[in-house]
């Protein structure tokens, strides 16, 4: 679940309004196709909200049903300057990358791929799979770590507990005295909140974090406003607690993080701290450069990068 769009605009983290304490903002999704006929709801980046902490990309895929042999099919494509983060809710998918990793991700598991200097990978549904429901996110790497060696980690066992009528699964960071196993480079939080019956939930927050709440199923009410599936509730920093009302059968993705101080640029499947970093990565990918690892380990035709939409000599 990556960016396969042929027309890509350059995105800067400073393109949208500054965060404000106690802000409550509704961010609406747009449809994007990612391969294999799978359409996702893309929440970030958008003109309304570029980032939540270091979280800089958010797709909600599904719930989708398809014929066997269909589903997710994203060919070899590159990344730099980020970590990809996949939370699988329903269905199974196969990850392959240019480091030689081959890994099936199943419901309740997380795949975390650190691109750093450069990596390439593929994503596809298993042959007999008929369902897909997942959240795909990117995490921008800080300037000091933007060029680290690539890596891949699979996390099948995550902290899970029940509280206030809600089942919590901790995906990233720390919450309620628990710590997720994911290796991160910025202060972040990710959690899945699911309930059977309608629930009122009191959350303890870090006032130094900004937050987002995305209903993946059902809906929620916060600050007197109701948010449906694929409506992201963005909350500025400055809160030490929050009360939520969850609809019956709701599932909500909770994201948080310390505001990302540096400006980053996003274009196609690249994150850079300058446009020059992105332009160099695009050129290296089109030339089949060894920067992106063993491309012969990946099956299928490579995705071609769109032309750079700005003047390279103006860097």
From Swiss-Prot:
Please report a single Pfam family linked to this protein: Pirin_C
Oxidoreductase in keyword set: yes
What is the protein name given in its UniProt record? Putative quercetin 2,3-dioxygenase PA1205
Q: Which UniProt keywords apply?
A: Dioxygenase, Metal-binding, Oxidoreductase
Q: Which SUPFAM superfamilies match?
A: RmlC-like cupins (SSF51182)
Pathway as given in its UniProt record: Flavonoid metabolism; quercetin degradation
Q: Which family does it belong to?
A: Belongs to the pirin family.
Catalytic activity entry: quercetin + O2 = 2-(3,4-dihydroxybenzoyloxy)-4,6-dihydroxybenzoate + CO
* Annotated cofactor note: Binds 1 divalent metal cation.
Q: Name one GO molecular function term.
A: quercetin 2,3-dioxygenase activity
Lineage, broadest ranks: Bacteria, Pseudomonadati, Pseudomonadota, Gammaproteobacteria, Pseudomonadales
Native organism is Pseudomonas aeruginosa (strain ATCC 15692 / DSM 22644 / CIP 104116 / JCM 14847 / LMG 12228 / 1C / PRS 101 / PAO1)
Q: Which residues bind a divalent metal cation?
A: 77, 79, 121, 123
Required cofactors, per record? a divalent metal cation
Give the E.C. number(s): 1.13.11.24
Outline what the protein does: Putative quercetin 2,3-dioxygenase.
The keyword Metal-binding is annotated on this UniProt entry: yes
Kindly give the InterPro entries that the UniProt entry links to this protein. Answer: Pirin, Pirin_C_dom, Pirin_N_dom, RmlC-like_jellyroll, RmlC_Cupin_sf
